[in-house]
């Protein structure tokens, strides 16, 4: 796929590449190259998120009112591409991409003002665990059944 970009997008690409060149240490690049799963090792991911946070780039997909960048879809694509090409560590997605959107959509103002800045700045790290009666965290062993009770189940 070939994406046409204009002068503004090319200038943005250069800004991102310059930033990455100045702020990605060899250690962070090595961590980025070693990434095998959905995110880089915690220490590298957190360190990189703090650098991006200081620049205002930690959450490109977030709304501006919550600390997002306000970038266009093309700018987000350019940023992701340049980060990949530079071997930047992958950020842990749980807080930024799963918990924060749930808080934005369903949290009250006190929850938003407390949790969102802490997620954005990498002050807090989030994880998700599952546990079900009789199965614990072994979700593959879950069993479901429906018992007819009158007109419903």
Locate the predicted segments by residue.
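Catalytic cores of large soluble enzymes that bind and process phosphate-bearing ligands
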Residues: 4, 8, 12, 37-40, ...
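Active-site phosphate/pyrophosphate- and oxyanion-stabilizing loops and adjacent acidic/basic residues
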Residues: 18, 77, 144
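Short secondary-structure junction/hinge motifs that connect adjacent elements
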Residues: 27-51
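Short, hydrophobic secondary-structure boundary micro-motifs
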Residues: 27-33, 61, 115, 128
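Conserved short loop/turn motifs at secondary-structure junctions
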Residues: 32-40, 64-68, 99-105, 131-134
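Internal helix-loop-helix
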Residues: 46-123
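Glycine-rich, Trp-frequent "lid" loop and neighboring beta-strands that shape
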Residues: 68-69, 110-153
């Amino acid at each position: 796929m070939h994406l046409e970009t204009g002068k503004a997008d090319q200038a943005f690409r250069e800004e991102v590449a310059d930033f990455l060149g100045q702020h990605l240490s060899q250690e962070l690049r090595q961590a980025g190259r070693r990434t095998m799963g959905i995110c880089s090792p915690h220490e590298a991911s957190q360190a990189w998120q703090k650098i991006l946070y200081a620049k205002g780039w930690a959450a490109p997909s977030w709304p501006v009112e919550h600390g997002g960048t306000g970038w266009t879809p093309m700018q987000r694509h350019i940023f992701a591409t340049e980060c990949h090409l530079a071997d930047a560590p992958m950020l842990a997605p749980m807080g930024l991409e799963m918990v924060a959107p749930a808080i934005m959509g369903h949290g009250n103002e006190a929850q938003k003002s407390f949790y969102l800045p802490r997620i954005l700045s990498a002050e807090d790290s989030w994880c998700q665990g599952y546990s079900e009666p009789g199965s614990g965290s072994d979700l593959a062993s879950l069993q479901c059944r429906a018992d007819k009770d009158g007109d419903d189940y």
